[in-house]
């Protein structure tokens, strides 16, 4: 007997990342090749015509798993009975805009969306914020949702998987090992140049990746800056921000969360106080996923260098939380 469709809400549906996401979700890459989906597409009133065009293309693919579509500019309609929400749409930073202004502009958007999700989505909804600054946007959405109740505030995540995948690729290049052989990578902190990609526990076919690299200068001066500033490098090269790789990371995050994974994965999740991170701050942690639930991997040793890096990215996040506290 075929499964009941799952409802997936996507904001910013007419945008570049949305366009890279929708066809892969409809083909079963995110929730499984036997799981029908209904896509609930949210975008601004002026983008509705473009959303209609994307829906026409989705129809023309004749995806067996695509059980229905809804297009709307009303968050209450978009999030109705949603099982998964991908919050892609966000106010981009424009020239001359201060980070504080960006936080305030997005704060308004994610307060509305967090409330609408909590009031309308399924109680066990899984929410992934892709739109930047994604950690703090997730923090804001979770705070708005908490006021309503119903949904689990721990299920409001920020996307660190893109940093994780970028780090894997750089390590594969450095070690000459296949990406698929690399296990137990961790990315701590904010999705920003302050993130800390940590391969101290990482292995490749049983070998220590730290021992294979064995180059502190490369780690500090090449690896971490390359991963941290990769988004800017792509804009420089392509003239547009990374859309397909961001969409791919979102699919990876939700797939592992819903379907489970035997691997360590990096997820931006509300802290429970682990590793000295204040409760509620949405922070990149090593996680494992089983049975539709995630848990933070405990007991990892934090050396002096790592603590310094973790504290640096934490400071950025606590500053952001402070900047938006009046909106919460």
Swiss-Prot record:
NAD(+) binds at residues 12-18, 106, 113, 130-132. It catalyses: (S)-malate + NAD(+) = oxaloacetate + NADH + H(+). The active site is at residue 191. Keywords: NAD, Oxidoreductase, Tricarboxylic acid cycle. It holds the Pfam family Ldh_1_N. GO terms for molecular function: L-malate dehydrogenase (NAD+) activity. Substrate binds at residues 93, 99, 132, 166. GO terms for biological process: malate metabolic process; tricarboxylic acid cycle. Its EC number is 1.1.1.37. The keyword NAD applies. NCBIfam families: MalateDH-SF1, PRK05442.1. This is Malate dehydrogenase.
């Amino acid at each position: 007997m075929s499964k009941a469709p799952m409802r997936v809400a996507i904001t910013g549906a007419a945008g570049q990342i949305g366009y890279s996401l929708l066809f892969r979700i409809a083909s079963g890459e995110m929730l499984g090749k036997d799981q029908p989906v209904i896509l609930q597409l949210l975008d601004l009133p002026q983008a509705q015509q473009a959303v209609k065009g994307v829906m026409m293309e989705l129809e023309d693919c004749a995806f067996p798993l695509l059980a229905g579509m809804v297009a709307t500019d009303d968050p209450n309609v978009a999030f109705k009975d949603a099982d998964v929400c991908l919050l892609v749409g966000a106010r981009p930073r424009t020239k001359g805009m201060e980070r504080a202004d960006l936080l305030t502009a997005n704060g308004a958007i994610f307060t509305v969306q967090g409330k609408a999700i909590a009031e309308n989505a399924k109680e066990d909804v899984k929410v992934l914020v892709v739109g930047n600054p994604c950690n703090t946007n997730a923090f804001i959405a979770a705070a708005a949702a908490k006021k309503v109740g119903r949904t689990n505030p721990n299920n409001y995540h920020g996307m660190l998987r893109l940093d994780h995948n970028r780090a894997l690729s750089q390590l594969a290049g450095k070690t000459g090992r296949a990406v698929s052989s690399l296990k137990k990578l961790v990315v701590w902190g904010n999705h920003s140049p302050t993130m800390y990609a940590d391969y101290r526990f990482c292995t490749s076919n049983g070998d220590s990746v730290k021992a294979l690299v064995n180059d502190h200068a490369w780690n500090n001066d090449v690896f971490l800056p390359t991963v941290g500033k990769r988004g800017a490098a792509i804009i420089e090269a392509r003239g547009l921000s990374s859309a397909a790789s961001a969409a791919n990371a979102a699919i990876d995050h939700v797939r592992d969360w819903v379907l489970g994974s035997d691997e360590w994965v990096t997820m931006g999740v509300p802290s429970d106080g682990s590793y000295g991170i204040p409760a509620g701050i949405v922070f990149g942690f090593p996680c494992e996923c089983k049975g539709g639930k995630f848990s933070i991997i405990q007991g990892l040793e934090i050396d002096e260098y790592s603590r310094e890096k973790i504290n640096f990215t934490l400071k950025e996040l606590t500053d952001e939380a402070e900047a938006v506290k009046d909106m919460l």
